A protein has these predicted regions:
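Short coil turns and loop connectors of transmembrane beta-barrels in diderm outer membranes
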Residues: 27-31, 45, 83, 129-132, ...
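Membrane-embedded beta-barrel scaffold of Gram-negative outer-membrane proteins
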Residues: 10-63, 69, 190
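Residues that define the transmembrane beta-barrel architecture of outer-membrane proteins
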Residues: 13-17, 41, 67-71, 114-120, ...
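Gram-negative outer-membrane beta-barrel transporters
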Residues: 34-43, 63-150
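Outer-membrane beta-barrel domain signature
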Residues: 6-10, 61-66, 76, 107-113, ...
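C-terminal beta-signal and adjacent terminal beta-strands/loops
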Residues: 141-150, 170-207
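Outer-membrane beta-barrel translocator domains and adjoining extracellular loop/strand segments
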Residues: 1-3, 46-56, 94, 98-107, ...
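Transmembrane beta-barrel domains of outer membrane proteins
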Residues: 20-24, 76-78, 90, 123-127, ...
């Protein structure tokens, strides 16, 4: 539902500022490791809100020039302890808020829904001479994200559980071609109840 269809502006207006610091140093040999820190802030001056929490049976689209921002902090670490062995780790924290309208005419500032609060990743890669074989393994941890309330009552909001993901890949170089074999989601993580009220698709609680 778009209450003010004629005045609805589909274009968002925002300003992003930030910076990065990088330091190279040695753990085993000179210059074998790099540490970097990034910070970026996006300040929204006109947001397009797809509000799932205005009411229990509608998604309301509207513009908002009220407080809305995203702060992102990220730390990256890369290390080559021995030749052809690369280790990479990263951690990202996200603080994201927006202001939504309420049916009583007031506003509420809430954490932006479905945005993970943090994410961390570890990747280890080893290559044989001339990179004929490359072995790659990745572990990832996804932090909780706020789930929009389905009742219209902001006190009912919940958070998704944090969950890990694991990936592995082997590649073989044959002439000008690369042959890949790999597996994603090795631990077979599955989301519980991905569809709410799946057995009753015409109810107001279906999502």
């Amino acid at each position: 539902v778009i209450p003010d269809f004629d005045g609805f502006n589909r274009l968002e207006k925002a300003l992003t500022v930030g910076g990065s610091l990088t330091q190279t140093f040695g753990l085993v040999s000179p210059g074998d490791a790099t540490l970097s820190f990034d910070y970026f802030r996006t300040q929204f001056y006109n947001s397009v809100i797809a509000d799932q929490e205005y009411s229990a049976d509608q998604i309301v689209l509207y513009n908002s020039d009220k407080r809305s921002y995203t702060d992102t902090y990220q730390i990256d670490f890369s290390w080559t302890p021995v030749e052809r062995l690369d280790i990479f780790a990263t951690f990202r924290y996200t603080d994201s808020e927006m202001t939504i309208d309420r049916p009583d005419g007031k506003t509420a500032r809430v954490e932006r829904p479905l945005v993970s609060q943090y994410k961390t990743l570890l990747n280890i890669q080893y290559a044989t001479k001339f990179r004929r074989w490359v072995f790659d393994a990745t572990a990832q941890l996804n932090g909780p994200a706020r789930i929009p309330t389905q009742t219209g009552d902001l006190a009912d909001d919940k958070y998704s559980p944090r969950y890990p993901m694991f990936f592995a890949q082997i590649s073989r170089k044959v002439g000008k071609f690369d042959i890949y074999a790999g597996c994603e989601n090795i631990a077979d993580y599955r989301q519980h109840d991905p569809i709410l009220n799946a057995d009753n698709p015409y109810s107001t609680g279906f999502n």
